[in-house]
């Protein structure tokens, strides 16, 4: 019962995805991983989960409400910290700060992390052997540690690559590519450009040379945009969400893209962007676009990068 309550409560924080607006396409970007993922919200999140789960599960298993609250709170507490280990950004200190914490040690989706952990928990529950759950916890800690080592190695490779080009980065980040911690995407910023590359860290190190794009300058790139318009405000909201890593799409000139994410680590092709319209009214919002039609070809290329072929 304790494990089930903790598991369900641990998933509850992501219910913030239902916070959306039919008139403001960017609203969900502000609220996903916001107050429900804040450290200060954890006790209240545990209470809310316990109010539901105690009467559905806890009471039937002979638990007091206090016990249900404790197990729900412990489960709920794991969610935000695990999310902060990913690359998306989590507002741990809301409402005191709107900083999005992203420790970049693991991909948002990584079966090599999730499946062994889930298997250990399920077997521990079915076989009534808590030691298996401890093995799962140990695996999670070890894997996160490996991700940290890999991130540091990827950043070192990124700085070395920048030095070879004669660049002194203003900032540089390394993020794991999709579903693994072997191949990483490095993004570094110079005075006027961003540079994106893929690197295979530690195991048979290798650089997958990428591309570069100019930083967004609204006066130059979109001179028609009214600074007082809602679209201009939406650009700044998207800049905050993207930690400043935004550029005009070189193919679609009215799109502003988040260059941090792509299906292949050495590409700039974004997974999402916002689209502005010159003819839009003053109060019209920018449109949010997703671009995830990579197909099997890109998946096979990523697999070759991971396996070192």
Predicted features by range, described:
Residues 1-156, 160-176:
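N-terminal membrane-targeting hydrophobic helices
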């Amino acid at each position: 019962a304790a494990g089930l309550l903790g598991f369900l409560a641990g998933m509850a924080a992501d219910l913030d995805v239902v916070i959306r607006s039919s008139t403001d396409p960017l609203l969900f970007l502000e609220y996903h991983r916001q107050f429900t993922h804040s450290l200060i919200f954890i006790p209240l999140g545990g209470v809310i989960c316990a109010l539901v789960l105690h009467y559905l599960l806890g009471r039937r298993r002979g638990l007091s409400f206090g016990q249900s609250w404790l197990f729900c709170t412990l489960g709920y507490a794991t969610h935000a910290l695990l999310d902060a280990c990913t690359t998306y950004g989590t507002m741990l200190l809301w409402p005191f700060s709107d900083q999005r914490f992203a420790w970049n040690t693991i991909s948002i989706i990584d079966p090599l992390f999730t499946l062994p952990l889930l298997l250990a928990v399920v077997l521990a529950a079915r076989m009534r052997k808590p030691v298996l759950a401890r093995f799962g916890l140990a695996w999670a800690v070890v894997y996160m540690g490996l991700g940290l080592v890999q991130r540091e190695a990827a950043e070192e490779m990124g700085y070395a690559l920048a030095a070879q080009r004669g660049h002194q980065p203003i900032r540089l980040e390394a993020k794991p590519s999709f579903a693994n911690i072997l191949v990483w995407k490095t993004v570094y910023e110079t005075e006027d450009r961003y540079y994106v590359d893929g690197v295979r860290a530690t195991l048979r190190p290798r650089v997958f040379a990428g591309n570069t794009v100019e930083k967004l300058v609204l006066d130059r790139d979109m001179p028609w945009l009214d600074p007082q318009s809602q679209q201009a405000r939406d650009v700044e909201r998207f800049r905050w969400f993207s930690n400043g890593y935004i550029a005009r799409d070189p193919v679609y000139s009215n799109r502003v893209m988040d260059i941090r994410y792509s299906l292949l680590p050495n590409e700039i092709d974004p997974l999402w962007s916002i689209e502005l319209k010159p003819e839009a009214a003053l109060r019209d919002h920018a449109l949010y676009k997703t671009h995830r039609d990579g197909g099997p070809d890109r998946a096979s290329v990523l697999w070759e990068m991971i396996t070192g072929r």
